């Protein structure tokens, strides 16, 4: 893709998200969503092949349906209340439809089917944008409408997302699909705390984006897309492979890594609000995510895939790509748990 065209497209993607996050008028928010969606489709089709075409078509249809539901909710709210302001509480029916529209845009279950398929059909850089930046705009709308959201509907979306995010990743060998199912589960965790402590939702979102960005950048550096190719990287790039596995365990929420902190804070906040069954169920279902990351770590680091190579470890590395920019990301992805007492300043 021409660098000038790519710069224009990326600027439009960022501008669309910024419009959604900063607008106080529902029509402007809808325009921001449409700008973002139409600009991100060429990024998904950057590598022109049938799989990316199929993935971008699925993404377009899903996002267009969600935008239609958004306009339905806004129009219904306009009929009942006569106002377009995002800051004013929505009508209960409009709030429910809006929640479903944002759930479809985020990929929350039962609207999750597009996420693994689209992520698998596109390149790693496009997948990184899809699973990180594209979550900001819908999450900002949910953040703004969070007080009057239907709690029963929200609990159903949360439980289904965390369960599907765990079950779906169990039988996968494609790393992009594993990351997609992990994204579904993380979106469930973020939504769980939305009505109790929206600030913690933003903290969880930032840590999720940090971990996912680090993981995808290491996948790009090692050209790894499957569990088999990941198992073959340890004798070429042992340090990078170790960092990949540690970051993935952090994504699964294994203490004492960084990914454990948001789960710990969310469970603590839910129990403070006299909710015991919900965090217990979420913690048990999160073990599914941790299991497939542990299994991936075990198969990569402690077992040997069949190989014709007699000498397993190379004595000379010819790896020339710079990894300097990864150092701060890897440190933040694995070692920020000791900083958690500083979160008391947010309260």
UniProtKB/Swiss-Prot annotation:
GO molecular function: NADH dehydrogenase (ubiquinone) activity
UniProt topology in membrane: Multi-pass membrane protein
Record EC number: 7.1.1.2
Entry GO CC: mitochondrial inner membrane
Record-linked Pfam families: NADH_dehy_S2_C, Proton_antipo_M
InterPro entries named among the record's database cross-references: Complex_I_Subunit_2, NADH_DH_su2_C, NADH_UbQ_OxRdtase_chain2, ND/Mrp_TM
Alphabetic keyword roster: Electron transport, Membrane, Mitochondrion, Mitochondrion inner membrane, NAD, Respiratory chain, Translocase, Transmembrane, Transmembrane helix, Transport, Ubiquinone
Membrane spanning residue stretches: 1-21, 25-45, 59-79, 111-131, 149-169, 178-198, 201-221, 237-257, 274-294, 326-346
Enzyme class: translocase
Catalytic activity entry: a ubiquinone + NADH + 5 H(+)(in) = a ubiquinol + NAD(+) + 4 H(+)(out)
BP GO terms, sorted: mitochondrial electron transport, NADH to ubiquinone
Function: Core subunit of the mitochondrial membrane respiratory chain NADH dehydrogenase (Complex I) which catalyzes electron transfer from NADH through the respiratory chain, using ubiquinone as an electron acceptor. Essential for the catalytic activity and assembly of complex I.
Family that this chain belongs to: Belongs to the complex I subunit 2 family.
Name the UniProt record assigns to this protein: NADH-ubiquinone oxidoreductase chain 2
